[in-house]
Curated annotation (Swiss-Prot):
Enzyme that can either act as an ADP-sugar pyrophosphatase in absence of diphosphate or catalyze the synthesis of ATP in presence of diphosphate. In absence of diphosphate, hydrolyzes with similar activities various modified nucleoside diphosphates such as ADP-ribose, ADP-mannose, ADP-glucose, 8-oxo-GDP and 8-oxo-dGDP. Can also hydrolyze other nucleotide sugars with low activity. In presence of diphosphate, mediates the synthesis of ATP in the nucleus by catalyzing the conversion of ADP-ribose to ATP and ribose 5-phosphate. Nuclear ATP synthesis takes place when dephosphorylated at Thr-44. It comes from Mus musculus (Mouse). Its EC number is 3.6.1.13, 3.6.1.58, 2.7.7.96. Homodimer. Interacts with PARG. Mg(2+) 1 binds at A95, E115. The modification Phosphothreonine is found at T44. Keywords: Acetylation, Hydrolase, Isopeptide bond, Magnesium, Metal-binding, Nucleus, Phosphoprotein, RNA-binding, Transferase, Ubl conjugation. One of its GO terms (cellular component) is nucleus. It catalyses: D-ribose 5-phosphate + ATP + H(+) = ADP-D-ribose + diphosphate; ADP-D-ribose + H2O = D-ribose 5-phosphate + AMP + 2 H(+); 8-oxo-dGDP + H2O = 8-oxo-dGMP + phosphate + H(+). Widely expressed. Most abundant in liver. GO terms for molecular function: 8-oxo-dGDP phosphatase activity; ADP-ribose diphosphatase activity; ADP-sugar diphosphatase activity; magnesium ion binding; nucleoside diphosphate phosphatase activity; nucleotidyltransferase activity; protein homodimerization activity; snoRNA binding. The modification Phosphoserine is found at S10. This is ADP-sugar pyrophosphatase. There is a cross-link at K41 (Glycyl lysine isopeptide (Lys-Gly) (interchain with G-Cter in SUMO2)).
Length: 218
């Protein structure tokens, strides 16, 4: 087994002191992380890490594709695919690993075209953000991409899935995304990815009136 030790100390703060490799596969590895809490007590944590990280800004990209067409409501493009760890179909943003020497923006456009067939333009790219920090150290860039639906190449897009990838492209209206996610999840017994659902919630709250503050009596 592989163990990495740290000799640094930081009183009053959390500090990882060692990471012991338990098992490793092609894509992920399982480690026992030993750390010190602010009181000086040593604790352990079971951690999953990707084996593909090589000094990149993040492991992957998650793409928020917004389809814009003349005389149509804006739509969000999602992909439905079977996820073995969940044992069910999931509704997600297009996503994938960043390849060596590739920028997050280039990776986002590549993954979007491969998984949905659409070609777009990057509107914004987030810094690296964590995916599931209680379980793994996986990080991603969230990249918003606009798609010109009037462009001839985007009228009948053809996905280019890789080996073993079986996806269904789903377009949902942006102005009613949360309601449509709930309905689709119930009808097709789908599990909606947390990032997609959080985006739907954010859109709903952004377009609704502010939460009312309870009247204070003196």
């Amino acid at each position: 087994m592989e163990t990495r030790e740290s000799t640094e100390s930081s009183p009053g703060k959390h500090l990882v002191t060692s990471e012991e490799l338990i098992s490793e596969g092609k894509w992920v590895k399982f480690e026992k992380t030993t750390y010190m809490d602010p009181t000086g007590k040593t604790r352990t944590w079971e951690t999953v890490k990707l084996t593909t990280r090589k000094g990149k800004s993040a492991d992957a990209v998650s793409v928020i594709p917004v389809l814009q067409r003349t005389l149509h409501h804006e739509c969000v493009i999602l992909v439905k695919q079977f996820r073995p760890p969940m044992g069910s179909y999931c509704l997600e943003f297009p996503a994938g690993f960043i390849e060596d020497g590739e920028s997050p923006e280039a990776a986002a456009l590549r993954e979007l075209e491969e998984e949905t067939g659409y070609k777009g333009e990057v509107a914004e790219c987030s810094p690296a953000v964590c995916m599931d920090p209680g379980l793994s150290n996986c990080t991603t860039h969230v990249v918003t991409v606009t798609i010109n639906g009037d462009d001839a190449g985007n009228v009948r897009p053809k996905p280019k899935p890789g080996d073993g990838e079986f996806m269904e492209v789903i377009s949902l209206p942006k102005n009613d995304l949360l309601t449509r996610l709930d309905a689709l999840g119930a009808e097709q017994h789908l599990t909606v990815d947390a990032k997609v659902y959080a985006y739907g919630l954010a859109l709903k709250h952004a377009n609704s009136k502010p939460f009312e503050v309870p009247f204070l009596k003196f």
